[in-house]
């Protein structure tokens, strides 16, 4: 396309063309077909006579730029010359005629002083085609939707953008992911709810302690899927912030503490390493095989707090049997209590598949307790504190003891789904006297 110089009309012409290009209207040139484009001239008679003598015709991306003077219509030269068009300050873009029986007319875009009025639809115009194809005209909303980015749920993948957004929720103190509610300092710095009570000032800017709630960030957190706290240990799951803490309490990838009671062992490790740790470090613990065994506690009359521990292996699982004697202080008097409980070296889900029974039997008397084993995550301390186990005082212990030794019959059974009891459901202690 060549530009012709002359008069102010050419400048307006160039201004309109550049305005259309800046408005991102797409015009594709078809070099094989299309109508001839009228020559653009100025409104002066001298410029019109000079340009009417030229026989060269131009194409402008299959677009006809039309306009009229006062009556807004084209006038053709009666001498057979190329029709002339006067370009005013306003013009209208129209689609070209397609060399086929049917023609397509797209909605127009009104251009005023080099700007596009967005109140009308715009057309994505393609070159002419030999087939009778009708091209649909998308609206502005449809065109905006076609180029809008698809925003994934944050945390569902491992791409860089998700990691960058998740980094906003990292606590600067413990480096864990913060969960709602979010509190920020006047400078906008955040800290998690676990670390905030321990701080005297903002750890980032040393300003006042974060105390302003950030409601906007909480709305964003509702769209984020946070990885499990133990993802570095192998957990592949991501959770909404409401479900994250509940999962982490029972996550099988969380580190396991040493289950041996009464010891100051601070060991932590994977579930598969617990038994190796007990055999190497706590060598005094004895392991018996079978579903029915006798747990013999010796020297139960020793003063002070004492505990007895042994292992029972059955159903390809390992169970820890614990008997503890503790001082129970009462305002009236101080008494000693015995607590017996069974713990599975496994998760809570696995523990729900078993039931254990403890029984004391001697001198024509019988005392029994039946319940679901505690998991290694739950431990035995809480069960003993709540007396959720076989509990009896020293007077009852003497009824079943012989020469200071107390034998407890332990039976472990596997149950199916129908027989499975509620986690908090246990049998009461049965005491029988023959």
Swiss-Prot record:
Give me the stretches of Low complexity compositional bias.
43-55
> What reaction gets catalysed by this protein?
S-ubiquitinyl-[E2 ubiquitin-conjugating enzyme]-L-cysteine + [acceptor protein]-L-lysine = [E2 ubiquitin-conjugating enzyme]-L-cysteine + N(6)-ubiquitinyl-[acceptor protein]-L-lysine
Q: Which residues bind Zn(2+) 1?
A: 228, 235, 247, 251
Q: Which GO terms are recorded in the biological process aspect for this UniProt protein?
A: proteasome-mediated ubiquitin-dependent protein catabolic process; protein ubiquitination
List cellular component terms (GO). Answer: cytoplasm
Binding of Zn(2+) 2 occurs at: 258, 265, 277, 282
ZnF locations on chain (SIAH-type):
223-283
- Give me the stretches of Polar residues compositional bias: 74-88
Q: Where is this region: SBD?
A: 220-415
Name of the top EC class for this enzyme: transferase
ZnF (RING-type) spans are: 171-206
Question: Which InterPro entries does the UniProt record give?
Answer: 7-in-absentia-prot_TRAF-dom, SINA-like_animal, Sina-like_RING, TRAF-like, Znf_RING, Znf_RING/FYVE/PHD, Znf_SIAH
Instruction: Please give the pathway this protein is involved in.
Output: Protein modification; protein ubiquitination
Quote the EC number.
2.3.2.27
Q: Does the keyword Metal-binding apply?
A: yes
Region of interest called Disordered, as start-end residue ranges on this chain:
27-88
Molecular function per GO? ubiquitin conjugating enzyme binding; ubiquitin protein ligase activity; zinc ion binding
Recorded hits in Pfam families, A to Z, give: Sina_RING (PF21362), Sina_TRAF (PF03145), Sina_ZnF (PF21361)
Q: CDD domains this protein is in?
A: RING-HC_SIAH1 (cd16751), Sina (cd03829)
Its quaternary organisation is: Interacts with tir-1.
The domain comment in this protein's record states: The RING-type zinc finger domain is essential for ubiquitin ligase activity. The SBD domain (substrate-binding domain) mediates the homodimerization and the interaction with substrate proteins. It is related to the TRAF family.
**Function recorded in the entry:** E3 ubiquitin-protein ligase that mediates ubiquitination and subsequent proteasomal degradation of target proteins. E3 ubiquitin ligases accept ubiquitin from an E2 ubiquitin-conjugating enzyme in the form of a thioester and then directly transfers the ubiquitin to targeted substrates. It probably triggers the ubiquitin-mediated degradation of different substrates.
> Which family does the record claim for this protein?
Belongs to the SINA (Seven in absentia) family.
Name used for this protein in its record: E3 ubiquitin-protein ligase siah-1
Record organism: Caenorhabditis briggsae
């Amino acid at each position: 396309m060549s530009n012709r110089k002359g008069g102010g009309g050419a400048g307006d012409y160039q201004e309109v063309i550049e305005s259309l290009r800046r408005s991102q209207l797409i015009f594709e040139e078809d070099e094989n077909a299309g109508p001839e484009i009228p020559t653009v001239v100025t409104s002066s008679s001298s410029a019109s006579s000079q340009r009417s003598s030229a026989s060269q015709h131009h194409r402008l991306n299959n677009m006809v730029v039309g306009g009229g003077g006062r009556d807004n219509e084209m006038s053709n030269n009666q001498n057979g010359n190329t029709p002339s068009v006067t370009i005013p300050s306003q013009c209208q873009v129209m689609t070209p005629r397609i060399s086929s029986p049917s023609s397509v007319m797209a909605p127009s875009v009104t251009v005023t002083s080099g700007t596009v009025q967005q109140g009308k639809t715009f057309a994505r115009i393609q070159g002419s085609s030999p087939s009778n194809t009708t091209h649909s005209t998308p609206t502005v909303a449809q065109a905006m939707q076609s180029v809008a980015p698809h925003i994934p749920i944050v945390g569902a993948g491992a791409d860089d953008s998700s990691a960058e957004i998740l980094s906003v929720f990292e606590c600067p103190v413990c480096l864990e992911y913060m969960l709602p509610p979010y509190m920020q300092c006047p400078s906008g710095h955040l800290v998690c709810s676990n670390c905030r009570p321990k701080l005297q000032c903002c750890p980032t800017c040393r300003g006042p302690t974060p105390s302003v709630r950030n409601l906007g960030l909480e709305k964003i957190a509702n769209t984020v899927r946070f990885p499990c706290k133990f993802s570095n240990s192998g957990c592949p799951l991501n959770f909404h912030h409401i479900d994250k803490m509940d999962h982490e309490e029972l996550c099988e990838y969380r580190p396991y503490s040493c289950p041996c009671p009464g010891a100051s062992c601070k060991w932590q490790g994977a579930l598969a390493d617990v038994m190796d740790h007990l055999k190497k470090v706590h060598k005094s613990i004895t392991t018996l095989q079978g579903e029915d065994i006798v747990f013999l506690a010796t020297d139960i009359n020793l003063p002070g707090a004492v505990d007895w521990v042994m292992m029972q292996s059955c159903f390809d699982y390992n169970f820890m049997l614990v008997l503890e004697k503790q001082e129970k202080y009462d305002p009236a008097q101080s008494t000693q209590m015995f607590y017996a409980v069974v713990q599975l070296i496994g998760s809570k889900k696995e523990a729900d598949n078993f039931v254990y029974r403890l029984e004391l039997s001697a001198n024509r008397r019988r005392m029994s307790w039946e319940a679901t084993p505690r998991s290694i995550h739950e431990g035995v301390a809480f069960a003993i504190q709540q007396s959720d186990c076989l509990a009896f005082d020293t007077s009852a212990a003497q009824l079943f003891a012989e020469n200071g030794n107390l034998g407890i019959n332990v039976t472990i059974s596997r149950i199916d789904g129908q027989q499975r009891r509620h986690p908090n459901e246990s049998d009461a202690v049965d005491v029988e006297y023959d």
